[in-house]
Amino acid sequence: MTLQAAPRSAAAQQREPDLRQEVHDAARRARVAARLLAVVPTGVKDRALHAAADAILAHVDRILSANAEDLDAARAADTPAAMLDRLALNPQRVDGIAAGLRQVAGLPDPVGEVLRGYTLPNGLQLRQQRVPLGVVGMIYEGRPNVTVDAFGLTLKSGNAALLRGSSSAARSNEALVNVLRSALDSEQLPADAVQLLSSADRSTVTHLIQARGLVDVAIPRGGAGLIDAVVRDAQVPTIETGVGNCHVYVHEAADLDVAERILLNSKTRRPSVCNAAETLLVDAAIAEHAMPRLIGALQDAGVTVHLDADEQDLRREYLAMEIAVAVVDGVDGAIAHINEYGTGHTEAIVTTNLAAAQRFTERIDAAAVMVNASTAFTDGEQFGFGAEIGISTQKLHARGPMGLPELTSTKWIVWGEGHTRPA
């Protein structure tokens, strides 16, 4: 995806200032809402989250009807199966979305948490505490659940959300956001704490990520093209998320029963998500007898195996039932390969050798490193802190699954008694 549109018609060029104004007006409304939410008590936010969950369940037929229209349009456009899976809602998934809001309501509120505090020799009392980021711009592809996840996490952390989802999920997102706004209104909270930028024009994204002074952070969540375009063109701070060229490395001291289970779970559980394995690395010392078993297991599960993987294969995020395979020379060979081809998301080693595992965890440059565990565990809920707004693959300001604390900044509060600084 590129944010720089192809040559624009005269009508589109004429509408450009209007789109910019629409985005900026929405951001200003979000700013007002964010300032109100920053001081809303935890109990009030939690009641609103439960009200939103109730409203989603009460309007499930309306939500599924809108989603069915999106799916019909996507199928007519020959959308790949993996993308259809991301787009699709059903009663069970809607139940899960509502349950996610209730789970967020039960999590500790990070706002106001004191990270450190002390008194200086001169008597000044210092306290560093968490505060909301402010206005969070979310740009994401065809996953309606992200709409609700973003709402829940931003609300609980005292932020306002400006959402720009994919046009492929436009009807689903509109139905969900309308329900969420009504729930906020019913709890006397500002409905503008969640707004959907509904224009399909890609310049909407550009205006959002260049709204300095109005948007505090932009979080792109989707494929490599979307993320790269946002990071390249943004004039507001961004948090890079999600591209997952994840590896499973089977060390020479691996238990092959364990390796097979981990490999299949990492690849086939949900191949269209960013924590799915995309490359199998096999230690040269065991390749002769391990490769037939592991490759056979993948093929039996319906995975297309790229044995003669080239440079493009090794850098590809398949997001499908496909995987690249490479043989590496020991743990150092695996480390070198992953640090060259990985995207800093999640990497796994399967081994019974503690020294090899420690060397791997210390030297792999990634947000999450698994030892004898599936890459599928890199997930906010699985990590024990509820829904996530994304999985950051950068090192500032957050890294790994981003929950509530990652949607805050800090503020220093200094108490004095008429203190003045000496000349």
Swiss-Prot record:
The keyword NADP applies. It is an enzyme of class 1 (oxidoreductase). Gene3D superfamilies: Aldehyde Dehydrogenase, Chain A, domain 1, Aldehyde Dehydrogenase, Chain A, domain 2. The keyword Ubl conjugation does not apply. GO terms for cellular component: cytoplasm. One of its GO terms (molecular function) is NADP binding. Its EC number is 1.2.1.41. It catalyses: L-glutamate 5-semialdehyde + phosphate + NADP(+) = L-glutamyl 5-phosphate + NADPH + H(+). Residues 1-14 have a biased composition (Low complexity). InterPro entries: Ald_DH/histidinol_DH, Ald_DH_C, Ald_DH_N, Aldehyde_DH_dom, G-glutamylP_reductase_CS, Glu-5-SA_DH, GPR_dom. Residues 1-25 are annotated as: Disordered. Catalyzes the NADPH-dependent reduction of L-glutamate 5-phosphate into L-glutamate 5-semialdehyde and phosphate. The product spontaneously undergoes cyclization to form 1-pyrroline-5-carboxylate. Belongs to the gamma-glutamyl phosphate reductase family. This is Gamma-glutamyl phosphate reductase. It comes from Mycobacterium marinum (strain ATCC BAA-535 / M). The gene is proA.
